[in-house]
Amino acid sequence: MLPFFDLGFIKIPSYSLMLVLGVIAYVINLLVVLKKEGKEPPVINKALTVSLFAFAVMGITAFIFDSIFHSIEVGYLVFGGITWAGGVVGSFPAFVILTHYFIKEERGSEIEFFSLVVPGIVLGHAFGRIGCFLGGCCFGGVTESCLGVVFPTGSPAAQTYPNTITGEGSFPVLPTQLFEAGFELLLYLFMIIFRKKFKYNNAEIYLISYGIFRFILEFLRGDSRGATCFFISPSQFLSLILIITGVLIILFKKRLVFTSLYDKLSLWREQVKTGVYDAPQSVESKNAEIYKEIELLHGLYQKGILTEEEYQSKKAELLNKI
């Protein structure tokens, strides 16, 4: 534990420093990856703006979920603290929705676009967990193994598990913060090494793998994290949401669930390719745009994305608008 970096003339909170480094790591990763993907500067700038708002949503939902779980635990309303999993639950849909409305060049490919920036999120979170270790929060339960770490007197771990034998510091506890940081670094390396193969699948890979890891890690945690109305911990509850979301994305990409939305996204992707999203929206051009959509639907039918019955049905709906 090292709460502050003492430079003599100034003391820098280690947790805050790690958070800043995590954000910097995310931004650098975003700039490098999107440039490699050939994204134009306007798209990259919009991605940074979307990220800013998504981070704001992350902070809000992380705070709200943590407050809810601690309120359930004590039986009355309390505020304070954050939970990463709760932040992801809020920021992922926020990023996707904001991408749809503010980055029209990626319309129809919102999840794939999010996948491109996921490695930066993973790396940034690794820095954050190192900050947790230095700050003394998010610690594990008491252990007699060689992995145990003794936190100093006054630390959260020492307050929870005071060493009644020596009277100083905490009993040895598992450094679950470092376990999670190690997992994040390994996951980041995986995404970098196999970037070409999985770069558009990072969203579901992250949601499922992190959800499973965090669910298991919760059995080793020893700090207070609130409570749920179920038999699992708050983070295990949120982890299940992440896992289910990741599985749904896989099924969605195979067009096994939310087929209407899948067809809309496919149509939007075709529109982006042909530049239809920039088409005038005047009354005079409405019919021409409808015929253009019919052409795009026909293209989806020829590619096997739509069945003949689906194509004819959607075509009839569009023709009725003329």
Q: Where do the protein language model's features map onto the residues?
A:
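Cys/His-rich metal-coordination motifs, chiefly Zn-binding "fingers/knuckles"
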Residues: 283-322
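Hydrophobic, membrane-interfacing alpha helices
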Residues: 1-286
